[in-house]
């Protein structure tokens, strides 16, 4: 990919891992892209190395893995998407416990609150974690922690809804703006029932 153009080939794996770790530490979405399953431009199956690279991006903590030429000019765009989805789903199902935990203490109140929310959800065995956000900040912070519980992020802002779709493990839902927590709680109940 792009790192391979800028760096010696042997440096790419560690630089990519370090970049992903740094982005997670600062709660920034990170997308691994370019030539992920490149052989699928002409072949219905990826190489083992490509499948491993895709899985390793997940295990390193990337929020998303993106295709480009494989689907825009490739002969097998649907197979490519299905293959990538299978690799990611299998890796998440069997290997998420290998994603390195964030060892640093939260640097902000928002970081401390989201970490506490994840810990409380685990201790209480909550069915899910819900957050309201206009900017997407709380959802972004929750995503970096890779919680075991599903996270639903409610927002009245459509651009924030779209932005949050980049965050790992976040299920964004659009709701009307509400000033009072009673209204917000009713929105959570209604939206969760609507979405199963």
Which residue ranges define each predicted feature?
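Long, charged amphipathic helices and adjacent flexible linkers at domain junctions
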Residues: 25, 83-118
């Amino acid at each position: 990919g792009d790192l391979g153009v800028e760096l010696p080939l042997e440096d790419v794996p560690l630089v990519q891992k370090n970049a992903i770790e740094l982005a997670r530490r600062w709660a920034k979405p990170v997308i691994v892209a370019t030539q992920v399953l490149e052989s699928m431009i002409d072949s219905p199956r990826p190489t083992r190395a490509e499948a491993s690279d895709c899985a390793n991006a997940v295990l390193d903590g990337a929020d998303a893995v993106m295709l480009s030429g494989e689907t825009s000019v490739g002969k097998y765009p649907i197979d490519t998407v299905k293959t990538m989805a299978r690799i990611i789903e299998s890796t998440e199902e069997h290997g998420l416990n290998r994603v390195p935990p964030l060892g640093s203490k939260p640097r902000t109140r928002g970081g401390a609150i989201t970490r506490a929310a994840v810990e409380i959800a685990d201790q209480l065995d909550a069915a899910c974690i819900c957050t309201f956000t206009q900017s997407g900040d709380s959802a972004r912070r929750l995503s970096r922690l890779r919680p075991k519980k599903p996270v639903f992020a409610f927002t009245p802002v459509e651009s924030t809804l779209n932005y949050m779709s980049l965050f790992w493990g976040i299920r964004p839902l659009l709701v009307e703006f509400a000033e009072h927590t009673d209204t917000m709680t009713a929105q959570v109940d209604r939206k969760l029932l609507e979405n199963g």
